[in-house]
């Protein structure tokens, strides 16, 4: 079996273990599936945490990490025929998996069902093609980068017309009663030479697709804080010989979620090339959207992009992670005004999977009254 992702990290799993239960086919991918030791932590509803959201909602053991592992073992052992990745039983097992990465963090065996699902979808698309809905959502970075005005118009048209909304629900499965997120009227963009004095230090701000086109106020607020603290904030831009030098960079998350690995690898290469100055100069790279920034610290390793990925990982920080580090080292010295407002914090599932919510709570604790 030829895989789309690099599963070599699991190469030594199960050596000498007669009870490892590694499926007959699939190589290292099968070993990634077999790490499950059936502890059934994914069937817990009493513990705090993420895993497993589909079970917590349905209370059906069929929608747990363990059940999905069982389905993959059956598929890779030949129980689902010669084309297991197109078998409806495997599709049913994965249908409610939301790729939260909770199992990678909270499962005692660290089953990475998110990555297993990406490979599954890639294998399936290679056989039967990716459906229109998948291609529409996965290519969001392209639509926003190339056709932002057209996309803004199309979303406005769909949100403003009950008829079009119902048609989109029938064709694409997008709930008609829910409005689609609107693109901002003006996207976020830093000056090419950066902004700020740099008396405290220098950082690169990785403005992802969502921070750039949907919620630019978040990127602007982050920039304002960093500049006020004395940092020079530089944009991450494509290299001059990039195939699309005017299109923003992308972490590849939307492609990975939908099993379009080749496209994710393309975006990973673009971003890796653009961040070479940060790697060479050991300059921190700050991200705002957890699923985007953390994909560069995680899935990028599985795409065969070389040793540079590991070096880049050392320079990547979520905004609050960077502030917490700088504060601990005595460099971040901003004081905040009193606040009597109530702040409700909902940690991103990927943020929780990487233990990054601690930094978020720490930074919020600096605000008097919180």
What are these regions (language model features)?
Residues 3-5, 114-370:
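Iron-sulfur cluster-binding electron-transfer modules in prokaryotic oxidoreductases
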Residues 2-148, 263-273, 308-313, 317, ...:
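Ferredoxin-type iron-sulfur electron-transfer modules in oxidoreductases and energy-metabolism complexes
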């Amino acid at each position: 079996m030829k895989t789309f992702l690099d599963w070599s990290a699991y190469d030594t799993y199960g050596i000498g273990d007669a009870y490892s239960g590694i499926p007959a086919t699939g190589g290292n991918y099968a070993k990634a599936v077999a790490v499950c030791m059936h502890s059934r932590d994914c069937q817990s509803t009493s513990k705090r945490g993420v895993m497993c959201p589909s079970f917590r909602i349905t209370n059906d053991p069929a929608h747990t990490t363990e059940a999905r592992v069982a389905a993959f073992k059956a598929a890779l052992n030949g129980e689902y025929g010669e084309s297991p990745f197109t078998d409806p039983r495997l599709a049913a097992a994965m249908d409610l998996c939301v790729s939260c990465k909770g199992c990678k963090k909270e499962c005692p065996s660290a089953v990475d069902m998110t990555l297993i699902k990406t490979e599954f979808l890639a294998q399936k698309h290679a056989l039967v093609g990716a459906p229109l809905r998948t291609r529409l959502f996965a290519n969001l970075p392209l639509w926003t980068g190339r056709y932002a005005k057209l996309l803004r118009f199309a979303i406005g048209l769909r949100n403003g017309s009950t008829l079009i909304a119902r048609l989109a629900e029938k064709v694409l499965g997008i709930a008609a009663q829910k409005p689609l997120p609107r693109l901002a009227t003006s996207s976020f963009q830093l000056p090419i030479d950066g902004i700020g004095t740099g008396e405290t230090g220098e950082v690169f701000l990785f403005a992802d697709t969502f921070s750039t086109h949907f919620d630019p106020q978040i990127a602007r607020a982050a920039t304002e804080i960093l500049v006020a603290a004395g940092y020079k904030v530089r944009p991450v831009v494509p290299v001059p010989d990039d195939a699309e030098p005017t299109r923003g960079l992308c972490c590849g998350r939307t492609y990975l979620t939908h099993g379009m690995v080749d496209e994710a690898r393309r975006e990973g290469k673009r971003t890796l090339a653009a961040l070479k100055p940060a790697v060479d100069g050991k300059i921190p790279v700050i991200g705002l959207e957890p699923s985007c920034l953390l994909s560069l610290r995680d899935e990028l390793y599985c795409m065969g992009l070389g040793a540079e990925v590991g070096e880049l990982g050392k320079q990547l920080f979520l905004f609050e992670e960077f502030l917490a580090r700088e504060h601990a080292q005595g460099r971040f010295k901003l004081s905040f005004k009193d606040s009597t407002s109530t702040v409700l914090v909902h940690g991103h599932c990927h943020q929780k999977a990487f233990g990054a919510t601690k930094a978020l709570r720490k930074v919020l604790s600096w605000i008097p009254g919180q």
